[in-house]
A protein has these predicted regions:
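Acidic-aromatic substrate-binding/catalytic surfaces of carbohydrate-active enzymes
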Residues: 2-7, 20-99, 107-109
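Short acidic, Pro/Gly- and aromatic-enriched capping/linker segments at domain boundaries
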Residues: 5-23, 189-208, 676-677
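Active-site-proximal substrate-binding groove within the catalytic cores of carbohydrate-active enzymes
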Residues: 26-28, 39, 44, 405-664, ...
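Conserved structural scaffold segments of CAZyme catalytic domains across common CAZy folds
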Residues: 72-330, 335, 350, 510-513, ...
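Trp/Gly-enriched beta-strand surface patches
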Residues: 161-212, 617-670
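Non-catalytic positions within long, well-ordered alpha-helices that form the structural scaffold/packing
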Residues: 271-272, 360-361, 506
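Aromatic- and carboxylate-enriched substrate-binding clefts and catalytic-loop regions
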Residues: 281-481
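C-terminal beta-strand-rich structural cap/linker in extracellular carbohydrate-active enzymes
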Residues: 670-746
Length: 747
């Protein structure tokens, strides 16, 4: 059996070979065989020879000026010399990239060319080193002397058998769905046994003489696991390698000011604490469309100061229409979306992007936060008084907006080295981050509710996202209302809650938009913020690795407490620190519980592949409270075909767990023959703690001291619900007093 590739460190180089009869693309984990005469795929297997396709059908299809062309019987097949996989832009990893894989991902490539009339149709097949992943791309060049219309374009078509339906994962770069990943019937279509990658409408694209049409790219991975949890970790590890910019994990402040003094003061504060980035967010006043030389010079001077502190910086721009920036006569409208969005394929939008990119270059920006585009928006075309559209009408509007305002604009920004926050799932085009999956109005709820909701959002959102692919929220200043009960200012007064929300952000790896003008307001508060910054920096790679989902947060009706203990669990097999575990008891009672924690991704188990699923209830039983009309959307769980985890015999492998990563707080835990770690914890009410795990013979070096007076999260006891003696006992069970309890000292 082939080892589980996510943990495998040995090389699995790819090859592309032409034999007399076939083109073979393969590595240790995946193999695709194409018949040279017909150009059809005749076999698609995993590293153990398991077949995914039932029969050959077609390699794809295009329709041009109403004439359909099936991709078969090629004119030419070429192997690209060397390790030449395609790159979409130049990319150099930033210092805060936790997994700086080379880009483009190394591998082999082959081109198959079909000549049809005056059209040259090229299909590029790429197979990557060290992973069970292929990529397939479609290009059409018009060699005629007149414009032709690409009516439809299908990059891939596979007839799958039962194994293929279950284990072949496909994703395209033509995706979106408001940040929740791909959805069926937009770029991927399943018709009984046939899996097709094609545009859901159009593209109806006018291709000028001598021009080349770029179809969607399809990523195809032969998954080794049939458990949803393990399969999603395979998808995340594919992303780390084919789009390594998603592993950039800066610590940032969502600054809501464009005042030079406040910006520079924030830079001093962030440099002191050890953050990476300032984001001048919406509401800050930054204007990325401003072409006034004096304004650009002022911004550049401020940004130069920020850079001198070792920080990166950038700002927010609005690419769509919101209530606070209504449509003007020069802003074309998506005719079928009730004027909520500009069309981003107009003369206006082309000028807009040029202004923004020019601003980024002139000011030395490192970052941009773009409100838009949202994928799958369409536009009905020109209307009186609107800007000139650069597309014809409805049928070509979706593809044209994607090409002009996602593919092309993103590439320009990446060439400048820009980190991109975007509101949709555009990672394969070059964006770094979008929302982890949350409802904005949740952050106008009381702080205890926010603490609980953040854990729910981060738990659910990290199934399909690497932690660094998502952001959450931490409203230092008021956001979407809620008043004093919702914001974390004054920070020292609310330090118990502020500490907890920073702790769970650190443990989850999902950094929130810390929205305000400062990180601390006292030396005591500074020490707490600095502590969590140091913890993140110490364990940064581990905290952006394999999130293991077990014991989810389950809120009670009032949304300020949970039913039971919940955990956040991160694992990595290549680092000294193998495991990071945060245990939360946001209940009003003391709980003793034996935890059964899957430890496969630590690399310390005796298993070649994971053969049990996480404990029952780690996905579908999670209730996600809603606060308004825009609840978060997460990918659908797949049927689990592995047995659920249960305690088993001692495997003989033990792990050393250090509470707070302190050598004097060592616990030795057993890993059983199912690869699960057994740990018994006793947690006071409204408390949390964390452990860092190492191989049994290892231990932390240069421990980070816990600052004097740190709340350690466990002081959020609501005094009206517990007797005074129980409050004092709960506090003194874990740490030295005095400690915070809802903003006041408990003595």
């Amino acid at each position: 059996m082939t080892p589980f590739w996510v943990l495998k460190t040995e090389k699995a180089p790819a090859s592309a070979v032409l034999t007399e009869d076939t083109l073979i693309l393969e590595n240790r984990y995946i193999r695709r065989v194409i018949d040279r005469k017909t150009g059809l795929t005749v076999s698609l297997t995993d590293g153990d020879g398991t077949e995914a396709i039932a029969r050959s059908i077609r390699e794809g299809a295009v329709s041009v000026d109403g004439t359909g062309y099936i991709l078969e019987n090629p004119s030419e097949i070429l192997i690209r010399e060397g390790s030449l996989t395609e790159k979409k832009f130049e990319y150099i990893p930033k210092p805060y990239n936790t997994h700086p894989y080379p880009y483009p991902a190394p591998g082999k490539a082959a081109e198959i060319t079909y000549l049809r009339d005056a059209l040259e149709i090229r299909v590029l097949y790429e197979i990557f080193d060290n992973m069970p992943v292929l990529r397939k791309s479609l290009y059409v060049t018009n060699h005629s002397d007149h414009t032709v219309t690409i009516n439809t374009a299908e990059t891939e078509a596979l007839c799958l058998n039962d194994t293929g339906k279950l284990q072949l994962y496909l994703e395209t770069d033509y995706t979106g769905n408001n940040g929740s990943g791909f959805q069926w019937n937009t770029s991927l279509f399943r018709d009984e046994d046939i899996m097709s990658a094609r545009f859901d409408m159009g593209p109806d694209y006018d291709l000028q003489a001598g021009g080349t049409f770029r179809g969607m790219q399809v990523y195809e991975m032969f998954c080794q696991s049939t458990c949803f949890e393990h399969r999603m970790n395979e998808v995340q590890n594919m992303y780390r390698r084919v789009a390594p910019w998603v592993c950039e994990a800066p610590l940032f402040l969502h600054l809501i000011s464009d005042d030079s003094k406040e910006l520079r003061d924030s830079a001093d504060m962030l440099a002191d604490i050890g953050y990476d980035m300032i984001i001048q967010s919406f509401g800050s006043g930054i204007d990325l469309e401003n072409e006034d030389p004096a304004y650009i010079e002022r911004v550049k001077n401020d940004y130069d100061y920020v850079h001198s502190k070792g920080l990166t910086i950038g700002g927010y721009t609005l690419a769509i229409i919101r209530d606070y920036r209504p449509m003007n006569h020069d802003c074309a409208t998506n005719g079928d979306h009730n004027q909520i969005s500009r069309c981003l394929c107009t003369k206006w939008s082309a000028d807009y992007w040029n202004r923004v990119v020019s601003f980024l270059a002139k000011t030395g920006s490192d970052f941009i936060e773009i409100d838009g585009p949202y994928h799958f928006y369409t536009c009905t075309g020109n209307k009186p008084g609107q800007a000139e559209h650069l597309h014809k009408g409805l049928a070509d509007s979706r593809y044209s907006q994607w090409l002009k305002s996602t593919v092309e604009v993103t590439a320009k920004m990446k060439e400048l080295g820009i980190y991109i926050n975007a509101p949709d799932w555009l990672y394969l085009s070059g964006t770094n981050k979008c929302g982890v999956g949350y409802e904005e109005i949740a952050f106008s709820q009381p702080r205890l509710t926010q603490i609980l909701m953040n854990r729910i959002y981060n738990y659910m959102g990290t199934y399909h996202k690497i932690p660094s692919m998502g952001w959450s929220f931490l409203p230092v200043e008021e956001y979407h209302g809620g008043g004093a009960a919702a914001k974390f200012e004054p920070l020292t007064e609310n330090l118990a809650e502020y500490d907890w929300v920073l702790a769970e952000a650190a443990a989850s790896g999902v950094w929130p938009c810390v929205r305000g003008k400062r990180l601390y307001d006292s030396e005591l508060c500074r020490q707490v913020v600095k502590y969590w910054t140091d913890v993140i920096r110490r364990h940064k790679k581990l905290l952006n690795s394999n999130t293991v989902h077990v014991y989810p947060p389950k809120p009670l009706k009032e949304l300020q407490t949970a039913e039971d203990i919940d955990v956040i669990l991160q694992e990595n097999n290549t680092t000294r620190d193998k495991l990071f575990l945060m245990v939360c008891n946001q209940t009003e009672r003391t709980i003793t519980k034996q935890l059964l924690l899957p430890a496969f991704y630590t690399g310390l188990t005796t298993l070649e592949r994971p053969h049990t699923a996480p404990k029952s209830g780690s996905f579908d039983d999670v209730t996600i409270p809603g606060f308004g009309s825009w609840p978060p959307v997460y990918p659908e769980n797949m049927e689990n075909l592995l047995e659920e985890a249960v305690p088993a015999e001692d495997s003989g492998v033990h792990m050393a767990l250090f509470e707070h990563d302190l050598p004097e707080k060592r616990t030795e835990a057993v890993i059983d023959t199912n690869g699960n770690l057994l740990l018994t914890v006793t947690m006071p009410p409204m408390s949390y703690t964390y452990y860092v795990g190492y191989a049994a013979e290892d231990m932390p070096e240069d421990p980070i001291p816990v600052p004097e007076g740190k709340p350690f999260g466990c002081r959020l006891i609501r005094e009206e619900t517990l007797p005074e003696t129980e409050i004092k006992n709960a506090v003194s069970d874990i740490c030295q007093i005095p400690r915070f309890c809802v903003g006041v000292y408990v003595t």
